[in-house]
Amino acid sequence: MLPRSINILKLRPTTQVTTTALRALATEAKTTLGATPGSTSTSTSTSTATTTTLESTSTSTSGDATETTIKETKSIKRKRTFFTDELNKGPSFDDFVSGKAKDMLEDPLELARKDPNAKLPLWLKVPIPKGKSFHNVKNDVRELKLSTVCEEAKCPNIGECWGGKKSEATATIMLLGDTCTRGCRFCSVKTNRKPGKPDPMEPENTAEAISRWGLGYVVLTTVDRDDLIDGGANHLKETVQKIKFKAPQILVEVLGGDFRGDLEMVKILANSGLDVYAHNMETVEALTPHIRDRRATYRQSLAVLRTAKETKPSLITKTSLMLGFGETDDQIRQTLKDLREVGCDVVTFGQYMRPTKRHMKVVEYVTPEKFDYWRDVALEMGFLYVASGPLVRSSYKAGEAFIENVLKKRKHNVGESPRMLQEVKPSIFKRA
């Protein structure tokens, strides 16, 4: 029970209350409660109440009445100060004076700055994109309202591809918009069940952009459009034909989807006039369900490559595998065997790099030496050409010159030695 001396809430109106008096009463109550035995629960609750800061507002007197307002100041939660806290854990002034600071193995200030997810091996670091050619390509893409896989998929080679000389600068155009109907766990392209309708001017604008760049070899890629009846096959066909009409000398590679397993759509694209039919396996069979969208299957992708080759045997068929998901050597070898069985001519190996924290983590950063090993293994198995390196991507322009050479020789009926093809190992893929 509270002592009468602090029962201030029932004061008579004529009583004059001052801030000093309130503080004195609170102090007296605290002392009294601390000395009263046998009242643990009461004293605890009262002590808690009396320790709350009491603030008496200015007293206004009207006649013989006095109105007193007591406010309880609520405790304010301290803001998070991670950087400051980490700094405080670091060397003190005395540590610097005594010289102990230099012996500390880790500086908490530096640890607070670093992002654990930003740590990459040296061979995966690339220069910041810049240069006149880079900005020219970027302006063309913006002006013609085109999407590129270089930007949408956050490709690390964008500076090299866009920033090359006039005869080399290129961008991989992404057709059917910038939004995919699928959601693979490795891909940073936007997803939506119902993307917008394809731009009817996209084929014409794509052909115009490519003709400006003066290229000999171009790569077109596409998002999956499961919302379209034909999966976008006829849109791709129209784009290829417009490019060939504007510049017949240009060799065209199309990296297409699986069209939900509709092989008739594969045949439409294969007969469109393209020169290289590409479709990516992405990973080994065991990991496919965990990495790719559930609508994409390993066997379905093999069927796409087989059908493209059977439809037009003169086509070069191409696929790509990403390493770093936790795949085993035996699984990779089996995948290469499966690819050779369906007549796949070209394979590329690249390192999976996590685009954002929302995507699956990297299990392993594969060394350049291991990439060289897989290049040699694939060439021994009979692939026409293999590009293998940490920064290699399926649409990476460095391999295009070699494939362009092969296609031109074929068109001029100049026979090439398979052994010669296998011995060519471009140093550009040995990136360090």
From Swiss-Prot:
[4Fe-4S] cluster 2 binds at residues 180, 184, 187. It catalyses: [[Fe-S] cluster scaffold protein carrying a second [4Fe-4S](2+) cluster] + N(6)-octanoyl-L-lysyl-[protein] + 2 oxidized [2Fe-2S]-[ferredoxin] + 2 S-adenosyl-L-methionine + 4 H(+) = [[Fe-S] cluster scaffold protein] + N(6)-[(R)-dihydrolipoyl]-L-lysyl-[protein] + 4 Fe(3+) + 2 hydrogen sulfide + 2 5'-deoxyadenosine + 2 L-methionine + 2 reduced [2Fe-2S]-[ferredoxin]. Binds 2 [4Fe-4S] clusters per subunit. One cluster is coordinated with 3 cysteines and an exchangeable S-adenosyl-L-methionine. It is found in: Mitochondrion. Pathway: Protein modification; protein lipoylation via endogenous pathway; protein N(6)-(lipoyl)lysine from octanoyl-[acyl-carrier-protein]: step 2/2. Residues 32-68 have a biased composition (Low complexity). It is an enzyme of class 2 (transferase). Its EC number is 2.8.1.8. [4Fe-4S] cluster 1 binds at residues 150, 155, 161, 395. Transmembrane segments: none annotated. Belongs to the radical SAM superfamily. Lipoyl synthase family. InterPro entries: Aldolase_TIM, Elp3/MiaA/NifB-like_rSAM, LIAS_N, Lipoyl_synth, rSAM. PROSITE patterns: RADICAL_SAM. One of its GO terms (molecular function) is lipoate synthase activity. Residues 165-384 form the Radical SAM core domain. Its cofactor is [4Fe-4S] cluster. One of its GO terms (cellular component) is mitochondrion. This is Lipoyl synthase, mitochondrial. Keywords: 4Fe-4S, Iron, Iron-sulfur, Metal-binding, Mitochondrion, S-adenosyl-L-methionine, Transferase. This protein may be expected to contain an N-terminal transit peptide but none has been predicted. Residues 32-71 are annotated as: Disordered.
